[in-house]
């Protein structure tokens, strides 16, 4: 049994140059854990609260208050306590905060400590994090990556409405081969855009952000890049979208500014269905606004038996909200973001609940990331079938892919890449 000896919080910078919380935890057996918390650009209104200082410092985005909470209230409560029971520790943190959305201490403060304790406890047991978090008796599995190679919406300063255009290299036997495929397509897309005289600057998540006339133009460019790289769109490489519809939703309608069009929920479901019919799209995230549950029902009835429909802003990694969606037959997949809910235990609970309901889980980064690679371990530990962690450039994104390569090597012959099984059986 290892007890918590010391907890320290600090303010560090994320990949967008904004402050975030990092925590260090030492146990009395000498084990050490460190974790840094990411931050989103398009956020769900029901996410756990990320505590920011306001004022002029760092344009109001400082996290000194959250760090102070780590170094006082949280440290005093945890010091001397056991690190062996993650669920009990996280419950203590939740109770210590006492609010329904962690707005007293800050989800960024709570999560940094929750993750750092998990890291320290893993080292205390002599295990990598994915083994420490893994359910007893379950086999490790490498997830299929959703690679965001073209950005629009809130993740880029361009005219494309859909926030993320992703490739999923599913037709491969090993994660390392899937990663190579993604990297080659990324470089092919850069050439395609350069030849058209378009920008090859990248957005927050490392994807290109060209000024294209429509969402279909973005899809066509990606299809061309897949073919130029020598791969088959659909068979080897599928497409996925993050529509981030909450950013498009105003006055009860969905607005595509780049195309000068707007739709009601049924019309927008039709628009997305047309894209699915025309392109090898196997997954759509946030296809409707987070508050438009009737629209989600329409979309699920229209496309839920055909493709994966992922709830991000809809579910915000919250088991209670997910249960409502399951009960109402809305979506068939959940995006998993640690900082949306604020503790390791609640995140694991959301994945377990999704799995029991037949929903897939997609473990995800945020647009404001750090060098922390814990989500790679989380995806492997929970057998989440997919991971979404950006493009094939920017160290904050590539760090997660590199961690998955290390895990694959460590697992050796036991390293199973999920490939086409990433999607529900009825989707192939």
From Swiss-Prot:
(2R)-2-phosphoglycerate binds at residues 163, 337, 366-367, 388. It is found in: Cytoplasm; Secreted; Cell surface. PROSITE patterns: ENOLASE. The keyword Transmembrane helix does not apply. Binds a second Mg(2+) ion via substrate during catalysis. One of its GO terms (biological process) is glycolytic process. GO terms for cellular component: cell surface; extracellular region; phosphopyruvate hydratase complex. Disulfide bonds: none annotated. InterPro entries: Enolase (IPR000941), Enolase-like_C_sf (IPR036849), Enolase-like_N (IPR029017), Enolase_C (IPR020810), Enolase_CS (IPR020809), Enolase_N (IPR020811). Gene3D superfamilies: Enolase-like C-terminal domain, Enolase-like, N-terminal domain. Catalyzes the reversible conversion of 2-phosphoglycerate (2-PG) into phosphoenolpyruvate (PEP). It is essential for the degradation of carbohydrates via glycolysis. This is Enolase. The gene is eno.
